[in-house]
A protein has these predicted regions:
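A short core secondary-structure module
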Residues: 1-27
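Glycine-rich beta->alpha junctions and the first turn(s) of the following alpha-helix
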Residues: 34-130
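C-terminal helix-coil-helix/basic helical segment that borders enzyme active sites and/or dimer interfaces
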Residues: 131-164, 174-185
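A generic local secondary-structure boundary/capping motif
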Residues: 4-8, 32-37
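Glycine-rich phosphate/cofactor-binding loops in nucleotide/flavin-utilizing enzymes
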Residues: 182-227
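Flexible, glycine/charged-enriched surface loops at secondary-structure junctions
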Residues: 106-110, 150-151, 188
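Charged/polar positions within long, soluble alpha-helices
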Residues: 95, 99-102, 131, 135-138, ...
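Generic structural signal for well-ordered, non-transmembrane alpha-helical segments
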Residues: 88, 124-131, 159, 163-170, ...
Length: 227
């Protein structure tokens, strides 16, 4: 699935269509060398004169946010599934931390860290952060399946769910690493990988800037231009 900009008599339009990997002009650069999310292999895609046949055009719409079924379908499923992915990362971080402190012993207290009140508080805090993520994702997913009309608030609320999940996961993994101590800093520790993966949530759509701009437009309307 690709999209491009077309200049038409009615003004600029966004065109969404399907191409095949075998199509002439399509190429992928093997450049996915990132801090985290390495398994996704999200390489740079090059489109050099690629032609999309008319039968593979999904929709043509005005640029920007749109209620077009194709645009909404792509965006809604992407944001919900991305939010659920980060929820899974955060919940796994809590599990790993709980397993770790159950075997890590405290020299000071002569027992495992799972009996240390401060460590117990930290892991409980991580779990509480993640506990608030799931309901928002599930409600949005149910409303998508049921065809609920949320009007103009749909796009901002979908972005908010992804953002909430990503930010919560980052805070959760940090708490888990603090609870586990320096060993979690090693690349061989699962929490190290989870932390690197959680950082990707800062950059994936919708980021903080576009999220806040969308909510400001929803609540306050567009910015008024000075006369």
């Amino acid at each position: 699935l690709i999209f491009g900009r077309a200049e038409t008599e009615e003004g600029p339009k966004s065109v969404f269509g399907i191409i095949h990997r075998s199509d002439e002009g399509y190429a992928i650069k093997d450049d996915w060398d990132t801090l985290g999310m390495r398994a996704t292999q999200s390489m740079t895609t090059f489109l050099r004169g690629v032609t999309v046949p008319e039968e593979r055009i999904l929709t043509v719409t005005d640029p920007g946010p749109s209620a077009d079924p194709v645009i909404f379908g792509i965006f809604s499923h992407f944001e919900i599934l991305l939010a659920a992915t980060y929820q899974g990362v955060g919940e796994r971080a809590v599990e790993v931390a709980a397993e770790h402190v159950a075997t890590r012993r405290s020299v000071k207290n002569q027992t495992t860290y799972s009996n240390d009140p401060d460590i117990r508080w930290r892991i409980a805090e991580a779990a509480l952060i993640m506990n608030a993520v799931g309901p928002q994702i599930r409600e949005l997913a149910r409303d998508i399946d049921a065809g609920v009309d949320r009007g103009r608030s749909w796009m901002p609320q979908l972005s908010a769910a992804k953002n909430a999940a990503a930010e919560a996961t980052l805070r959760t993994v940090e708490q888990a690493m603090r609870a586990c101590g320096g060993s979690a800093y090693y690349n061989t520790h699962e929490l190290s990988r989870l932390y690197r993966d959680a950082l990707a949530g800062l950059f994936q759509p919708s980021d903080q800037e576009s999220l806040h701009a969308a909510w400001a437009n929803l609540i306050l309307g567009p910015i008024e231009k000075a006369q």
